[in-house]
């Protein structure tokens, strides 16, 4: 198969960059500084990468004007304010796109479902009663859309995804393999030593430009809906419980778990393996560092941490012993000791000042 080539001046135009060098050069792909060849375009994202750039074999470089001055031995550049953003834009140029439309013969679609003529429905897809699939949406093989599910325009639903509970997806949503949207929330009423299942009657609403990774679970609401606003991005292996509300442009990394009825604000970042207890509220513009555990409301923007960083093993054991010893000492006793030490310091300072 012939590889698509792009001229350097075409690529510069796409990112609104300034071309320096030979615009007619042809490029077949993007590549890292380390592995780029003469037919590859690469980018330099900061001064720390300049040493790599100087020895790279790439045919052209996406850089800022300031970074270019450090590469006098190179000839071909695209000058932009943000090289990483330009790189992100150009990845879509070189990405292999699914251009098929229509419905594969093995798909099972209920007669009441409304499927756009420009959509693609892959092999062994099952689409239930009263479903809607919008223009240019791709649904890969072995995916199931249960009754009353709606998927908007320009969406991509990868293989083995299940969307149920009457979930509604807006436009340009991407969902990757083996994720479940709208599954039953974890709701049970305890009575007389038994757990009594609560039927989940809400749904899941997903906004525009949302990206959800593989092997995620986003549960339908118990009564109200679980909501992901526009621009939310979610990594693999994330659990979002029933009635959670996630604000626009929030990013959630792998292995995070968010318990039920919690509301997370806009433009937040949850780093890997964070846990958020239920029925809490987190303000806009909050960052949680890796392995943080949120057990109370966060009302102000900022960066918060609770995960313990790595220790050498023997150091860790000694630290744990000290923590246990500290826990055995009453807080009032510690406070009295600190007050006594403070009084001694003040007495010494007073004596020293008098002798002056």
Swiss-Prot record:
Top-level taxon of origin: Bacteria
UniProt keyword Glycoprotein present: no
Entry keyword annotation includes Repeat: yes
Catalytic activity reported: a UDP-3-O-[(3R)-3-hydroxyacyl]-alpha-D-glucosamine + a (3R)-hydroxyacyl-[ACP] = a UDP-2-N,3-O-bis[(3R)-3-hydroxyacyl]-alpha-D-glucosamine + holo-[ACP] + H(+)
Pathway annotation from the record: Bacterial outer membrane biogenesis; LPS lipid A biosynthesis
The entry's keywords: Acyltransferase, Lipid A biosynthesis, Lipid biosynthesis, Lipid metabolism, Repeat, Transferase
InterPro entries: Hexapep (IPR001451), LpxD (IPR007691), Trimer_LpxA-like_sf (IPR011004), UDP_GlcNAc_AcTrfase_non-rep (IPR020573)
Annotated disulfide bonds: none
EC number: 2.3.1.191
A biological process term (GO) from this entry: lipid A biosynthetic process
Class in the EC hierarchy, top level: transferase
Matching NCBIfam families: lipid_A_lpxD (TIGR01853), PRK00892.1 (NF002060)
Record text on subunit structure and interactions: Homotrimer.
UniProt cross-references to PANTHER family, sorted A to Z: UDP-3-O-ACYLGLUCOSAMINE N-ACYLTRANSFERASE (PTHR43378), UDP-3-O-ACYLGLUCOSAMINE N-ACYLTRANSFERASE 1, MITOCHONDRIAL-RELATED (PTHR43378:SF2)
Family in the record: Belongs to the transferase hexapeptide repeat family. LpxD subfamily.
Protein name per Swiss-Prot or TrEMBL: UDP-3-O-acylglucosamine N-acyltransferase
């Amino acid at each position: 198969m012939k590889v698509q080539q792009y001229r350097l001046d075409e690529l510069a135009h796409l990112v609104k960059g300034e071309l320096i060098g030979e615009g007619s050069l042809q490029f077949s792909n993007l590549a890292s500084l380390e592995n780029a060849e003469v037919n590859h375009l690469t980018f330099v994202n900061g001064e720390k990468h300049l040493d790599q750039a100087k020895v790279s074999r790439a045919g052209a470089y996406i850089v800022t004007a300031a970074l270019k001055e450090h590469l006098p031995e190179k000839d071909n550049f695209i000058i932009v304010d943000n090289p990483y953003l330009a790189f992100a834009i150009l990845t879509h140029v070189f990405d292999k796109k699914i251009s098929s439309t229509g419905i594969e013969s093995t798909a099972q679609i209920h007669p009441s479902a409304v499927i756009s003529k420009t959509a693609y429905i892959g092999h062994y897809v099952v689409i239930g009663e009263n479903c809607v699939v919008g223009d240019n949406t791709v649904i890969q093989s072995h995916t199931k859309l249960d009754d009353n599910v709606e998927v908007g325009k320009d969406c991509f639903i990868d293989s083995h995804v299940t969307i149920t509970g009457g979930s509604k997806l807006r436009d340009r949503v991407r969902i990757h393999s083996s994720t479940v949207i709208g599954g039953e929330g974890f709701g049970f009423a305890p009575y007389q030593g038994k757990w009594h299942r609560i039927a989940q009657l809400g749904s899941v609403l997903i906004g525009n430009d949302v990206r959800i990774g593989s092997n995620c679970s986003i549960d339908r609401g118990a009564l109200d809906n679980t909501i992901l606003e526009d621009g939310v991005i979610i990594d693999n292996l994330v659990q979002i419980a029933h009635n959670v509300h996630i604000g626009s442009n929030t990013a959630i990394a792998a292995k995070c778990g968010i318990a039920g009825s919690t509301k997370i604000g806009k433009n937040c970042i949850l780093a890997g393996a964070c846990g958020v207890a239920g029925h809490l509220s987190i303000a806009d513009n909050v960052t949680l560092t890796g392995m943080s555990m949120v057990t109370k409301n966060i009302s102000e923007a900022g960066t918060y941490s609770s995960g313990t960083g790595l220790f050498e093993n023997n150091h860790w054991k000694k630290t744990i012993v000290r923590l246990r010893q500290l826990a055995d000492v009453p807080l009032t006793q510690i406070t009295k000791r600190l007050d006594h030490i403070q009084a001694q310091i003040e007495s010494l300072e007073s004596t020293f000042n008098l002798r002056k």
